[in-house]
Amino acid sequence: MIAIVDYGVGNIKNVERAVNHLGYDAQLTSDFDTIKESSHIILPGVGHFKDAMTALKASGLDKLLIELQDKKPMIGICLGMQLMFEHSDEGDVEGLGMIPGRVVSIDTPYPVPHLGWNNLESKHPLLDKDVYFIHSYYVQTPAPIIATAEYGLPITAIVQKDNKIGIQFHPEKSGDFGLAILDQALKGGFIHD
């Protein structure tokens, strides 16, 4: 069973539908035992970084996720990806610290938020099409960046560190291509030894 962490932030039902559509057993949950027993953890989210961290801390889910970070594959989607990092300039708040790096404001001549379809740029053969973004902040990280999207500057679109994968765009809203990316992430990601 794949645990989709329900911490009261964002449109997470679409993520559950997408994972189930791929043939996996996904469950929205905030129950500690269910999360501990899961095979994978997905941390979704849309909204403000500070509000999300406040919700995770209030429930104790932040400590649980940190405890499990090396024991289970984890996928962060959109705000969920950003929460996996050390710090965000959005609200000047510490994140979960699972992946080195920080979340910074998109400083570009283009409209912010970065909203709509944008092409991925990557050396990985799967990652060559448009995906759906909606965000005003992006990640700067020394961790392996799997794909970027150009938006006046290179936006980190997919990052992977060990068993942790961050996806800035919404694979659940990116059609069959987005589902294929989500499936690949659930199968272990994009870096293989």
Name what the model sees in each region.
Residues 1, 26-37:
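Short acidic low-complexity segments
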Residues 126-129, 160-165:
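Beta-strand-turn-beta hairpins that frame and shape the catalytic cleft
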Residues 86-153:
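Pocket-forming structural segment of enzyme catalytic cores
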